[in-house]
């Protein structure tokens, strides 16, 4: 396994561990989730370039679109929670239910 793939996989695992460890604050969870998506995008782009298959070049772009949508929804939730409660705890998400 080349070192670049091992480094990208290690970045994904570190972001996953960060998501599992620091899930009390919404901002840290969103940052770790973005790190996971960035490493997935990089790995996907490298693999699609190495495969030389023209249809596989669309997959990283689709993943990037989903990452942008996830970031927008996450930031909207963060702004709504911080304006309502003044804190960004994940526990406050349970208070948003009707």
Swiss-Prot record:
Its main location: mitochondrion. Its EC number is 7.1.1.2. GO terms for cellular component: mitochondrial inner membrane; respiratory chain complex I. It catalyses: a ubiquinone + NADH + 5 H(+)(in) = a ubiquinol + NAD(+) + 4 H(+)(out). The keyword Electron transport applies. It holds the Pfam family Oxidored_q2. One of its GO terms (molecular function) is NADH dehydrogenase (ubiquinone) activity. Belongs to the complex I subunit 4L family. Core subunit of respiratory chain NADH dehydrogenase (Complex I) which is composed of 45 different subunits. This is NADH-ubiquinone oxidoreductase chain 4L. The lineage of its organism: Eukaryota, Metazoa, Chordata, Craniata, Vertebrata. The gene is MT-ND4L.
